[in-house]
Amino acid sequence: MSLEPFKQSEALTFGVELELQLVNRHDYDLAPFAPDLLRALKGAEHAGDIKPEISPSMIEISTGICHSYQQALEELTVMRDLMVAASRSLNLGIAGGGTHPFQQWSDRTISDSPRYQYISELYGYLAKQFTVFGQHVHIGCPSADESLFLLHAIGRYVPHFVALAASSPYVQGVDTGFASARLNSVAAFPMSGRAPFLLTWDAFTAYFEKMRNTGVIESMKDFYWDIRPKPEFGTIEVRVMDTPLTVQRACDIAAYIQMLARYLLLSRPFMPQEDDYLVYTFNRFQACRFGLEGEYVHPNELTRMPIADHILSICDALVPHAEALGSLPALANIRALAERRDGDAHWLRQVDAEARSQRETVRKACDQWAA
């Protein structure tokens, strides 16, 4: 399949995708309720989409094309409320979080779709281990070349996005020590990591065709990059976030990405360069391991500071962009979270320490999602 042309889209519009956990109310383990929930929701009126994922223990909700933070918040809230209402008759719980705290990957089944069955056949057990839950944010770009500029410019802020959304401290009943253990599952795939440093669509098309001719990939879907262009939508897709525990935080993070994109496209505070990636993997690891307490190394100045402080250092520059986009409340929430340094991973650990029961932790995560 050749690379399709980059579709024209309205700059700085955005969309949000959230992968959610489906658990039974008996022991709060993952359960394959997606087909039942989708049947219960058939005919429900809402913007956006609700659809199955790689495992029937997951479900994805996504907004339409959003122009504002408030629109995204309203669309996701409506879908959340519809799903929560439908879940009651199914004795089903729905939760955010990047990983389920104690599910066993070997118990999972793969959804019966050609794409997911292909992934299972190609990647073996990695497909079942990929029962993790992420937030993806699409940002509309004014042109194909601008999409690549934005992809690499916003790459500097990947540690922000990871740390702000981190909600996966537990894997198979064990505290991993990570704030976001989910990304370790993604890293096992061969085409994961960061996109190649290319700044023109002609160069990117040549790269894509070369990779396709090797047989390594067939389409853009085979790239599991942290940020990837989506030519069929005219967007870039930021893919590093765990699914937060609440719709509110998911929308705050999406709005933060949108305002950063506006700042980078209009102000051009720097030009991306290959050397930006010298510290990329280190910064990303710090965000995964330590969350907002992790260290951020500036790629040019080589100074070090906590990720939370680096977030706070950019907030003032984002104020006019947040104001123009109608997302000042989201910026205030992001600033407050960075000041507190107590994200969702911290909340999950605190609940687990008090309850001494991961089942109870999942139950309370379901309550958080429904609130």
UniProtKB/Swiss-Prot annotation:
Q: Does the keyword S-adenosyl-L-methionine apply?
A: no
**Disulfide feature:** none
Signal sequence residues: none
**Keywords per UniProt:** ATP-binding, Ligase, Nucleotide-binding
What biological-process terms (Gene Ontology) are attached? Answer: modified amino acid biosynthetic process
Q: What does this protein do?
A: ATP-dependent carboxylate-amine ligase which exhibits weak glutamate--cysteine ligase activity.
The entry's family comment says: Belongs to the glutamate--cysteine ligase type 2 family. YbdK subfamily.
HAMAP family from the UniProt entry? Glu_cys_ligase_2 (MF_01609)
**Protein name according to UniProt:** Putative glutamate--cysteine ligase 2
